[in-house]
């Protein structure tokens, strides 16, 4: 068993990306069990077979990266993975659902949202982050 506590945290972004691939290759080649501690969600998602999300010393959820991303156990888990972060808002903002204020929260990831034509919605874009392959709009 290999234990690693944030081994890539002090490296620059390019080297960190290169070493993620190399560490995963070595781990697969050796067939070794590795317990890898990180606060970097990209490291967790790309390197792990299973991820454990902790809060206050307690395990909130254990599962594959895809399971945790698509079916988080709670708001804490949902807010830990995804770039950009999940959008959370009170369910009472959804018209016509009859949900009492403060009882439920809706989480929406950006890949599941569509920008409405101006005739059917309103909003104002405050900032745009151009990232090359994608752009993040901030409302």
Question: Where do the model's predicted regions map?
Answer:
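ABC ATPase nucleotide-binding domains
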Residues: 1-76
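Structural detector for hydrophobic anchor residues on beta-strands
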Residues: 50, 89, 119-121
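Short glycine/serine/threonine-biased micro-segments
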Residues: 50, 61, 80, 105, ...
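Short, conserved beta-strand edge motifs with alternating hydrophobic and charged residues
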Residues: 54, 80-82, 90, 105-109
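Residues located in well-ordered beta-strands
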Residues: 64, 76, 90-92, 122-126
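C-terminal boundary and immediately downstream tail of ABC-type ATPase nucleotide-binding domains
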Residues: 70-96
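Non-catalytic connector elements of ABC transporters
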Residues: 84, 95-139
